[in-house]
């Protein structure tokens, strides 16, 4: 018998943006199919006054409390207050910091938002994002050799979101659509530095996505072909043939999240760069 869906409050308190905490909370919540978290996110909490207001909200809607607060005084207030309210509280980073401290033999500096310093890595990500957004969907740059990754594939194979995810990791990614019967730009076949990866999916999966998100510039007479599984299968065979002829690796994204697809591409990129 299927258990009914239940809901619970999940309070996420951070002295930074809360991205780390949100990812951890959602990863844990995803393990419970019959429970849904009502998320309450409190970023940039760095004073006791701010924290007291947050705690009032938790008292009004009790639930699990996760926090990433490096100030030990504020962390103690959270734990003590939650204990009084009878709700669980967990410092997500504390076990990790303790492990680092034990292994490195040195205490952490405990600086809020230390991971968000405007350093070279930060500006590399911004540069990659600009590159990706300027060269999305076949807008190949004259300086194509600056690209780290070029994704190719038929419509609705997650090329753009995967490119953007990679750019957030500091990877200059661009993408080129494969359209049945239309030759790809010659520059793709002469590029030396970029890793070129083909993205595919099942015809069923692509048809479903295309029905939900039709392509705006498809003429009405072609709309049926755009979502027809037989036609999509022909497109996929055409795309696979191109990739196989050129030795481009292929990733099936049918059952992969964007994160999983990006992880596979990053593994291919490491091997590509090692070969030189």
UniProtKB/Swiss-Prot annotation:
Query: In which family does this protein belong, per the annotation?
Result: Belongs to the pyruvate, phosphate/water dikinase regulatory protein family. PDRP subfamily.
Which keywords label this protein? Kinase, Nucleotide-binding, Serine/threonine-protein kinase, Transferase
| One Gene Ontology term of the molecular function aspect | ADP binding
Q: Does the keyword Acetylation apply?
A: no
**What task does this protein carry out?**
Bifunctional serine/threonine kinase and phosphorylase involved in the regulation of the pyruvate, phosphate dikinase (PPDK) by catalyzing its phosphorylation/dephosphorylation.
Which N-terminal stretch is annotated as signal sequence? none
Q: What is this protein called?
A: Putative pyruvate, phosphate dikinase regulatory protein
Q: Which residues bind ADP?
A: 153-160
List the Pfam families. Kinase-PPPase (PF03618)
Keyword Endoplasmic reticulum appears in the UniProt entry: no
Which organism does this sequence originate in? Answer: Brucella anthropi (strain ATCC 49188 / DSM 6882 / CCUG 24695 / JCM 21032 / LMG 3331 / NBRC 15819 / NCTC 12168 / Alc 37) (Ochrobactrum anthropi)
Report the InterPro entries cross-referenced here: Kinase-pyrophosphorylase, PPDK_reg
Entry-linked HAMAP family: PDRP
Which reactions does this protein catalyse? N(tele)-phospho-L-histidyl/L-threonyl-[pyruvate, phosphate dikinase] + ADP = N(tele)-phospho-L-histidyl/O-phospho-L-threonyl-[pyruvate, phosphate dikinase] + AMP + H(+); N(tele)-phospho-L-histidyl/O-phospho-L-threonyl-[pyruvate, phosphate dikinase] + phosphate + H(+) = N(tele)-phospho-L-histidyl/L-threonyl-[pyruvate, phosphate dikinase] + diphosphate
EC assignment: 2.7.11.32, 2.7.4.27
């Amino acid at each position: 018998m299927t258990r009914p869906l239940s809901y619970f409050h999940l309070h996420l308190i951070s002295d930074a943006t809360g991205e780390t905490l949100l990812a951890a909370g959602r990863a844990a919540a995803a393990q419970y199919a019959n429970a849904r978290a009502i998320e309450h996110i409190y970023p940039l909490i760095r004073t006791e006054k701010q924290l007291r207001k947050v705690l009032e909200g938790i008292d009004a809607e009790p639930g699990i409390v996760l926090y990433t607060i490096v100030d030990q005084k504020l962390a103690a207030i959270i734990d003590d207050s939650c204990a009084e309210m009878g709700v669980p509280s967990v410092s997500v980073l504390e076990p990790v910091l303790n492990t680092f401290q034990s292994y490195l033999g040195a205490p952490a500096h405990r600086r809020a938002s230390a991971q968000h310093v405007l350093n070279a890595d930060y500006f590399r990500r911004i540069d990659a994002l600009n590159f990706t957004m300027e060269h999305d969907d076949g807008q190949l740059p004259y300086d194509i050799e600056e690209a780290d990754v070029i994704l190719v594939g038929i419509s609705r194979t997650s090329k753009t979101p995967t490119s953007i995810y990679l750019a957030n990791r500091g990877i200059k990614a661009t993408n080129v659509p494969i359209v049945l019967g239309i030759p790809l730009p010659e520059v793709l076949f002469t590029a030396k530095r970029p890793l070129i990866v083909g993205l595919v999916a099942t015809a069923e999966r692509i048809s479903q996505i295309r029905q939900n998100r039709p392509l705006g510039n498809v003429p009405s007479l072609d709309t049926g072909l755009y979502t027809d599984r037989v036609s999509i299968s022909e497109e996929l065979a055409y795309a696979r043939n191109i990739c196989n002829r050129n030795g481009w690796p292929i990733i099936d994204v049918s059952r992969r999240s964007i994160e999983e697809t990006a992880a596979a591409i990053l593994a291919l990129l490491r091997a590509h760069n090692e070969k030189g």
